[in-house]
Amino acid sequence: MNSFIQALAQKAVELDPSFLTGRPTDIQQQQSWSRKIDIGDFSILAIGEQSHGTHEFFKARISLIRLLVKQQPVTKIGLEAPMAEVENLNTYLLSDSGDLKMILKSFQLYSYECEEFVDLVETVKIINAQHGKKISFFGFDFQSPYQVLNNLKRYGKNHELAQTVDALVSDYTQLNAYVSQHAISPDDFRSLDSLSQLVIKPLETNAKSSRIKDGFLEKNLIQYQQFLSLNDPEKNRADVQVMSQMRDSLMAQNVLREYSSGQKMILLAHNAHVQKTADAYSRTMGQFLLQAIGAMQYRCIGLTTSRGFFTAYNPQQQKITATNSVIPPHSDAFEFYFSKIAKPIFFLPTSGMTALNPDSGPDKYRLLPYGVPKNQFIRGNLLQAFDYIIHIENTTGNKSFYLH
Protein backbone atom coordinates (compact mmCIF):
# COMPACT_ATOMS: atom_id res chain seq x y z
CA MET A 1 0.00 0.00 0.00
CA ASN A 2 2.99 2.31 0.39
CA SER A 3 3.34 2.39 -3.41
CA PHE A 4 -0.31 3.44 -3.69
CA ILE A 5 0.20 6.27 -1.20
CA GLN A 6 3.36 7.34 -3.03
CA ALA A 7 1.51 7.38 -6.35
CA LEU A 8 -1.24 9.50 -4.83
CA ALA A 9 1.31 11.90 -3.34
CA GLN A 10 3.11 12.28 -6.67
CA LYS A 11 -0.04 12.99 -8.66
CA ALA A 12 -1.99 15.07 -6.13
CA VAL A 13 -1.48 18.82 -6.62
CA GLU A 14 -1.65 20.71 -3.34
CA LEU A 15 -3.93 23.74 -3.37
CA ASP A 16 -3.56 26.91 -1.35
CA PRO A 17 -6.11 27.46 1.47
CA SER A 18 -7.27 30.56 -0.42
CA PHE A 19 -9.06 28.18 -2.80
CA LEU A 20 -11.65 27.61 -0.08
CA THR A 21 -12.48 31.30 0.26
CA GLY A 22 -14.18 31.43 -3.13
CA ARG A 23 -12.31 34.65 -3.90
CA PRO A 24 -8.72 35.09 -5.09
CA THR A 25 -7.06 38.07 -3.43
CA ASP A 26 -5.17 39.08 -6.58
CA ILE A 27 -4.40 38.06 -10.17
CA GLN A 28 -1.36 36.04 -9.09
CA GLN A 29 -3.52 33.87 -6.86
CA GLN A 30 -6.04 33.36 -9.67
CA GLN A 31 -3.20 32.36 -12.02
CA SER A 32 -1.88 29.94 -9.40
CA TRP A 33 -5.27 28.21 -9.25
CA SER A 34 -5.35 28.04 -13.04
CA ARG A 35 -1.90 26.42 -13.26
CA LYS A 36 -2.70 23.80 -10.64
CA ILE A 37 -6.23 22.87 -11.75
CA ASP A 38 -6.11 21.72 -15.35
CA ILE A 39 -9.52 20.43 -16.44
CA GLY A 40 -8.95 20.62 -20.18
CA ASP A 41 -11.77 20.76 -22.69
CA PHE A 42 -15.33 19.68 -21.91
CA SER A 43 -18.90 20.22 -23.00
CA ILE A 44 -20.53 19.32 -19.69
CA LEU A 45 -18.50 19.49 -16.49
CA ALA A 46 -20.24 18.19 -13.37
CA ILE A 47 -18.95 19.24 -9.95
CA GLY A 48 -20.12 16.94 -7.19
CA GLU A 49 -20.07 17.02 -3.40
CA GLN A 50 -20.02 14.27 -0.78
CA SER A 51 -22.72 16.03 1.22
CA HIS A 52 -25.16 18.83 0.50
CA GLY A 53 -24.22 20.49 3.79
CA THR A 54 -20.50 21.27 3.66
CA HIS A 55 -19.22 24.87 3.78
CA GLU A 56 -15.91 24.13 2.02
CA PHE A 57 -17.60 22.30 -0.87
CA PHE A 58 -19.68 25.39 -1.66
CA LYS A 59 -16.57 27.59 -1.55
CA ALA A 60 -14.57 25.20 -3.73
CA ARG A 61 -17.38 25.24 -6.30
CA ILE A 62 -17.41 29.05 -6.31
CA SER A 63 -13.65 29.07 -6.93
CA LEU A 64 -14.03 26.50 -9.71
CA ILE A 65 -16.78 28.54 -11.37
CA ARG A 66 -14.60 31.68 -11.23
CA LEU A 67 -11.73 29.73 -12.76
CA LEU A 68 -13.69 27.89 -15.44
CA VAL A 69 -15.63 30.85 -16.82
CA LYS A 70 -12.30 32.57 -17.53
CA GLN A 71 -11.01 29.51 -19.38
CA GLN A 72 -14.17 28.33 -21.18
CA PRO A 73 -17.25 30.03 -22.69
CA VAL A 74 -19.61 28.64 -20.03
CA THR A 75 -23.21 29.77 -20.60
CA LYS A 76 -25.26 27.62 -18.21
CA ILE A 77 -25.03 26.23 -14.69
CA GLY A 78 -27.37 23.33 -13.96
CA LEU A 79 -28.67 22.70 -10.45
CA GLU A 80 -30.01 19.60 -8.73
CA ALA A 81 -33.24 21.50 -8.08
CA PRO A 82 -36.72 21.61 -9.65
CA MET A 83 -36.82 23.11 -13.13
CA ALA A 84 -39.78 25.45 -12.61
CA GLU A 85 -38.49 26.92 -9.35
CA VAL A 86 -35.03 27.57 -10.84
CA GLU A 87 -36.65 29.74 -13.52
CA ASN A 88 -37.53 32.15 -10.70
CA LEU A 89 -33.88 32.10 -9.62
CA ASN A 90 -32.93 33.10 -13.17
CA THR A 91 -35.29 36.04 -13.01
CA TYR A 92 -33.46 37.18 -9.87
CA LEU A 93 -30.06 36.57 -11.45
CA LEU A 94 -30.67 38.32 -14.76
CA SER A 95 -33.10 41.10 -13.80
CA ASP A 96 -32.43 41.48 -10.06
CA SER A 97 -36.11 41.05 -9.21
CA GLY A 98 -37.59 38.84 -6.52
CA ASP A 99 -36.67 37.80 -2.99
CA LEU A 100 -33.73 35.39 -3.19
CA LYS A 101 -34.41 33.76 0.18
CA MET A 102 -38.05 33.11 -0.74
CA ILE A 103 -37.00 31.70 -4.11
CA LEU A 104 -34.60 29.29 -2.41
CA LYS A 105 -37.29 28.32 0.10
CA SER A 106 -39.58 27.39 -2.81
CA PHE A 107 -37.08 24.69 -3.86
CA GLN A 108 -38.20 22.75 -0.76
CA LEU A 109 -34.58 21.62 -0.41
CA TYR A 110 -33.12 23.06 2.78
CA SER A 111 -29.54 22.54 1.57
CA TYR A 112 -29.94 25.53 -0.78
CA GLU A 113 -31.15 27.77 2.05
CA CYS A 114 -27.74 28.81 3.30
CA GLU A 115 -25.30 31.72 3.17
CA GLU A 116 -22.93 29.80 0.89
CA PHE A 117 -25.45 29.27 -1.91
CA VAL A 118 -26.47 32.93 -1.73
CA ASP A 119 -22.76 33.72 -2.17
CA LEU A 120 -22.63 31.43 -5.21
CA VAL A 121 -25.61 33.15 -6.84
CA GLU A 122 -24.20 36.61 -6.13
CA THR A 123 -20.81 35.52 -7.52
CA VAL A 124 -22.42 34.48 -10.82
CA LYS A 125 -24.28 37.80 -10.91
CA ILE A 126 -20.97 39.67 -10.45
CA ILE A 127 -19.29 37.57 -13.17
CA ASN A 128 -22.12 38.45 -15.56
CA ALA A 129 -21.81 42.16 -14.77
CA GLN A 130 -18.02 42.40 -14.84
CA HIS A 131 -17.32 40.25 -17.87
CA GLY A 132 -20.37 40.91 -20.01
CA LYS A 133 -21.46 37.29 -19.75
CA LYS A 134 -25.00 35.93 -19.60
CA ILE A 135 -24.55 32.80 -17.56
CA SER A 136 -27.92 31.46 -16.48
CA PHE A 137 -29.09 28.71 -14.15
CA PHE A 138 -31.35 25.81 -15.04
CA GLY A 139 -32.83 23.06 -12.91
CA PHE A 140 -32.69 19.44 -14.00
CA ASP A 141 -34.62 17.90 -11.11
CA PHE A 142 -38.40 17.58 -10.83
CA GLN A 143 -39.37 16.60 -7.29
CA SER A 144 -41.70 19.53 -6.52
CA PRO A 145 -45.18 19.94 -8.08
CA TYR A 146 -45.99 23.45 -6.85
CA GLN A 147 -44.40 26.01 -9.17
CA VAL A 148 -44.86 23.82 -12.22
CA LEU A 149 -48.61 23.59 -11.56
CA ASN A 150 -48.83 27.37 -11.11
CA ASN A 151 -47.02 27.75 -14.43
CA LEU A 152 -49.45 25.38 -16.16
CA LYS A 153 -52.37 27.27 -14.65
CA ARG A 154 -51.43 30.30 -16.78
CA TYR A 155 -52.30 28.33 -19.90
CA GLY A 156 -55.82 27.45 -18.79
CA LYS A 157 -58.38 28.90 -21.17
CA ASN A 158 -61.26 28.12 -18.85
CA HIS A 159 -62.08 28.47 -15.17
CA GLU A 160 -62.41 24.71 -14.78
CA LEU A 161 -58.71 24.04 -15.49
CA ALA A 162 -57.66 26.72 -13.01
CA GLN A 163 -59.91 25.18 -10.36
CA THR A 164 -58.40 21.75 -11.03
CA VAL A 165 -54.88 23.12 -10.57
CA ASP A 166 -55.93 24.78 -7.31
CA ALA A 167 -57.40 21.48 -6.10
CA LEU A 168 -54.16 19.65 -6.96
CA VAL A 169 -52.02 22.21 -5.14
CA SER A 170 -54.28 21.91 -2.10
CA ASP A 171 -54.06 18.09 -2.16
CA TYR A 172 -50.27 18.11 -2.53
CA THR A 173 -49.98 20.60 0.32
CA GLN A 174 -51.93 18.27 2.61
CA LEU A 175 -49.78 15.31 1.50
CA ASN A 176 -46.51 17.25 1.50
CA ALA A 177 -44.70 14.94 3.94
CA TYR A 178 -45.51 11.96 1.71
CA VAL A 179 -44.62 13.87 -1.46
CA SER A 180 -41.12 14.67 -0.19
CA GLN A 181 -40.57 10.99 0.67
CA HIS A 182 -42.11 9.65 -2.58
CA ALA A 183 -44.53 7.73 -0.38
CA ILE A 184 -47.93 8.73 -1.79
CA SER A 185 -50.38 5.86 -1.29
CA PRO A 186 -51.83 4.07 -4.36
CA ASP A 187 -55.33 5.43 -3.64
CA ASP A 188 -54.10 9.00 -3.21
CA PHE A 189 -51.97 8.74 -6.33
CA ARG A 190 -54.90 7.49 -8.45
CA SER A 191 -56.94 10.50 -7.33
CA LEU A 192 -54.07 12.91 -8.01
CA ASP A 193 -53.33 11.36 -11.38
CA SER A 194 -56.98 11.56 -12.48
CA LEU A 195 -57.08 15.25 -11.62
CA SER A 196 -53.70 15.78 -13.27
CA GLN A 197 -54.87 14.34 -16.58
CA LEU A 198 -57.63 16.98 -16.64
CA VAL A 199 -54.81 19.53 -16.76
CA ILE A 200 -52.26 17.71 -18.91
CA LYS A 201 -54.44 16.43 -21.76
CA PRO A 202 -56.07 19.72 -22.84
CA LEU A 203 -52.74 21.55 -22.60
CA GLU A 204 -51.03 18.86 -24.70
CA THR A 205 -53.84 19.15 -27.26
CA ASN A 206 -53.45 22.93 -27.38
CA ALA A 207 -49.67 22.61 -27.75
CA LYS A 208 -49.99 20.18 -30.66
CA SER A 209 -52.52 22.33 -32.49
CA SER A 210 -50.52 25.54 -32.08
CA ARG A 211 -48.43 26.68 -35.03
CA ILE A 212 -45.86 28.22 -32.69
CA LYS A 213 -43.88 25.91 -30.41
CA ASP A 214 -44.08 27.02 -26.79
CA GLY A 215 -40.89 25.81 -25.13
CA PHE A 216 -41.95 27.03 -21.68
CA LEU A 217 -45.20 25.05 -21.79
CA GLU A 218 -43.40 21.98 -23.10
CA LYS A 219 -40.77 22.13 -20.34
CA ASN A 220 -43.40 22.44 -17.62
CA LEU A 221 -45.49 19.59 -19.00
CA ILE A 222 -42.38 17.41 -19.07
CA GLN A 223 -41.46 18.30 -15.48
CA TYR A 224 -44.92 17.56 -14.14
CA GLN A 225 -45.18 14.26 -16.01
CA GLN A 226 -41.75 13.27 -14.66
CA PHE A 227 -42.92 14.14 -11.15
CA LEU A 228 -45.97 11.91 -11.60
CA SER A 229 -43.87 9.04 -12.94
CA LEU A 230 -41.47 9.17 -10.00
CA ASN A 231 -44.36 9.12 -7.52
CA ASP A 232 -46.46 6.47 -9.27
CA PRO A 233 -46.52 3.43 -6.93
CA GLU A 234 -46.93 1.09 -9.90
CA LYS A 235 -43.74 2.43 -11.47
CA ASN A 236 -41.53 3.03 -8.45
CA ARG A 237 -42.77 -0.06 -6.52
CA ALA A 238 -41.63 1.71 -3.32
CA ASP A 239 -38.15 0.51 -4.27
CA VAL A 240 -35.27 2.92 -3.58
CA GLN A 241 -33.15 1.48 -6.40
CA VAL A 242 -35.97 1.75 -8.95
CA MET A 243 -36.72 5.35 -7.92
CA SER A 244 -33.03 6.26 -7.88
CA GLN A 245 -32.40 5.02 -11.42
CA MET A 246 -35.62 6.55 -12.73
CA ARG A 247 -34.73 9.91 -11.24
CA ASP A 248 -31.13 9.88 -12.51
CA SER A 249 -32.11 8.83 -16.02
CA LEU A 250 -34.74 11.58 -16.24
CA MET A 251 -32.33 14.19 -14.82
CA ALA A 252 -29.86 13.21 -17.55
CA GLN A 253 -32.59 13.71 -20.17
CA ASN A 254 -33.34 17.16 -18.74
CA VAL A 255 -29.66 18.13 -18.94
CA LEU A 256 -29.46 16.96 -22.54
CA ARG A 257 -32.52 19.03 -23.46
CA GLU A 258 -30.63 22.10 -22.22
CA TYR A 259 -27.45 21.13 -24.04
CA SER A 260 -26.56 22.00 -27.62
CA SER A 261 -23.43 21.08 -29.56
CA GLY A 262 -20.51 23.41 -28.93
CA GLN A 263 -21.99 24.69 -25.69
CA LYS A 264 -20.19 24.64 -22.33
CA MET A 265 -22.14 24.04 -19.15
CA ILE A 266 -21.44 23.24 -15.51
CA LEU A 267 -23.61 20.96 -13.37
CA LEU A 268 -23.79 21.12 -9.57
CA ALA A 269 -25.13 17.99 -7.87
CA HIS A 270 -24.27 15.33 -5.33
CA ASN A 271 -21.30 13.05 -6.04
CA ALA A 272 -23.78 10.17 -6.24
CA HIS A 273 -25.46 11.74 -9.28
CA VAL A 274 -22.46 13.07 -11.23
CA GLN A 275 -20.11 10.08 -10.94
CA LYS A 276 -19.48 8.07 -14.12
CA THR A 277 -20.08 4.66 -12.55
CA ALA A 278 -23.09 3.12 -10.84
CA ASP A 279 -23.41 3.96 -7.16
CA ALA A 280 -24.77 1.79 -4.35
CA TYR A 281 -28.33 2.35 -5.55
CA SER A 282 -28.42 2.42 -9.34
CA ARG A 283 -26.97 3.77 -12.55
CA THR A 284 -26.26 7.48 -12.24
CA MET A 285 -27.03 10.67 -14.14
CA GLY A 286 -23.32 10.91 -14.93
CA GLN A 287 -23.34 7.42 -16.39
CA PHE A 288 -26.28 8.27 -18.65
CA LEU A 289 -24.63 11.52 -19.78
CA LEU A 290 -21.34 9.74 -20.45
CA GLN A 291 -23.19 7.23 -22.60
CA ALA A 292 -24.98 10.01 -24.50
CA ILE A 293 -22.10 12.39 -25.32
CA GLY A 294 -18.89 10.46 -24.62
CA ALA A 295 -15.95 10.63 -22.23
CA MET A 296 -14.28 13.60 -23.93
CA GLN A 297 -17.42 15.73 -23.64
CA TYR A 298 -18.66 14.72 -20.17
CA ARG A 299 -16.22 15.25 -17.30
CA CYS A 300 -16.83 15.12 -13.56
CA ILE A 301 -15.14 16.27 -10.36
CA GLY A 302 -15.78 14.59 -7.02
CA LEU A 303 -15.36 16.61 -3.81
CA THR A 304 -14.30 14.52 -0.81
CA THR A 305 -13.37 14.91 2.85
CA SER A 306 -11.95 12.81 5.67
CA ARG A 307 -13.11 14.47 8.87
CA GLY A 308 -15.03 17.34 10.36
CA PHE A 309 -18.75 18.12 10.39
CA PHE A 310 -21.66 18.65 8.00
CA THR A 311 -25.07 20.32 8.15
CA ALA A 312 -28.15 18.12 7.89
CA TYR A 313 -31.46 17.32 9.53
CA ASN A 314 -30.62 15.33 12.64
CA PRO A 315 -33.53 13.00 13.53
CA GLN A 316 -32.37 12.59 17.12
CA GLN A 317 -32.41 16.33 17.72
CA GLN A 318 -35.35 16.80 15.33
CA LYS A 319 -33.80 19.85 13.73
CA ILE A 320 -31.11 20.92 11.26
CA THR A 321 -27.70 20.99 12.92
CA ALA A 322 -24.19 21.85 11.71
CA THR A 323 -22.35 19.47 14.03
CA ASN A 324 -23.07 16.10 12.44
CA SER A 325 -19.78 14.20 12.42
CA VAL A 326 -17.83 13.24 9.32
CA ILE A 327 -16.61 9.88 10.58
CA PRO A 328 -12.85 9.37 10.02
CA PRO A 329 -12.27 6.66 7.38
CA HIS A 330 -10.83 3.20 7.98
CA SER A 331 -8.18 1.53 5.81
CA ASP A 332 -10.80 0.09 3.42
CA ALA A 333 -11.78 3.61 2.28
CA PHE A 334 -10.04 5.83 -0.28
CA GLU A 335 -10.24 8.83 2.04
CA PHE A 336 -8.00 7.01 4.53
CA TYR A 337 -5.15 7.09 1.97
CA PHE A 338 -5.95 10.65 0.90
CA SER A 339 -5.24 11.62 4.51
CA LYS A 340 -1.84 9.92 4.42
CA ILE A 341 -0.26 12.17 1.80
CA ALA A 342 -0.12 15.24 4.08
CA LYS A 343 -1.75 17.67 1.65
CA PRO A 344 -4.73 19.31 3.40
CA ILE A 345 -6.32 20.38 0.10
CA PHE A 346 -5.40 18.79 -3.22
CA PHE A 347 -6.49 18.34 -6.83
CA LEU A 348 -6.11 14.81 -8.22
CA PRO A 349 -6.51 13.86 -11.90
CA THR A 350 -7.51 10.18 -11.77
CA SER A 351 -6.38 9.21 -15.27
CA GLY A 352 -3.96 6.30 -14.99
CA MET A 353 -4.54 5.91 -11.26
CA THR A 354 -6.89 2.92 -11.37
CA ALA A 355 -4.12 0.48 -12.26
CA LEU A 356 -2.18 1.61 -9.19
CA ASN A 357 -4.99 0.63 -6.83
CA PRO A 358 -4.09 -2.90 -5.64
CA ASP A 359 -6.76 -5.60 -5.40
CA SER A 360 -6.32 -5.62 -1.64
CA GLY A 361 -6.63 -1.84 -1.48
CA PRO A 362 -9.58 0.42 -0.67
CA ASP A 363 -12.98 -0.52 -2.04
CA LYS A 364 -15.18 2.05 -0.29
CA TYR A 365 -15.77 5.79 -0.29
CA ARG A 366 -17.96 8.22 1.61
CA LEU A 367 -21.50 9.07 0.53
CA LEU A 368 -23.61 11.41 2.67
CA PRO A 369 -27.15 11.76 1.30
CA TYR A 370 -29.84 13.92 2.92
CA GLY A 371 -30.04 13.39 6.65
CA VAL A 372 -27.51 11.65 8.89
CA PRO A 373 -26.83 8.10 7.65
CA LYS A 374 -25.73 5.40 10.06
CA ASN A 375 -23.26 4.06 7.49
CA GLN A 376 -21.29 6.80 5.74
CA PHE A 377 -19.38 4.56 3.30
CA ILE A 378 -20.44 2.58 0.24
CA ARG A 379 -18.57 0.11 -1.95
CA GLY A 380 -17.00 1.41 -5.13
CA ASN A 381 -13.85 2.71 -6.76
CA LEU A 382 -13.52 6.46 -6.32
CA LEU A 383 -10.77 6.65 -8.95
CA GLN A 384 -13.02 5.10 -11.58
CA ALA A 385 -16.04 7.17 -10.59
CA PHE A 386 -14.51 10.61 -11.25
CA ASP A 387 -12.13 12.23 -13.73
CA TYR A 388 -10.82 14.52 -11.00
CA ILE A 389 -11.02 14.67 -7.22
CA ILE A 390 -10.64 17.67 -4.97
CA HIS A 391 -9.99 16.43 -1.46
CA ILE A 392 -10.40 18.70 1.57
CA GLU A 393 -9.10 16.99 4.69
CA ASN A 394 -11.12 18.93 7.27
CA THR A 395 -14.56 20.37 6.58
CA THR A 396 -17.33 22.16 8.47
CA GLY A 397 -21.10 22.42 8.20
CA ASN A 398 -22.57 25.09 5.98
CA LYS A 399 -24.38 28.12 7.39
CA SER A 400 -27.99 27.08 6.99
CA PHE A 401 -30.63 29.73 7.61
CA TYR A 402 -32.35 27.18 9.86
CA LEU A 403 -29.51 27.26 12.38
CA HIS A 404 -30.59 30.70 13.63
Model-derived regions: residue spans:
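Structured catalytic-domain cores with a bias toward divalent-metal coordination
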Residues: 1-404
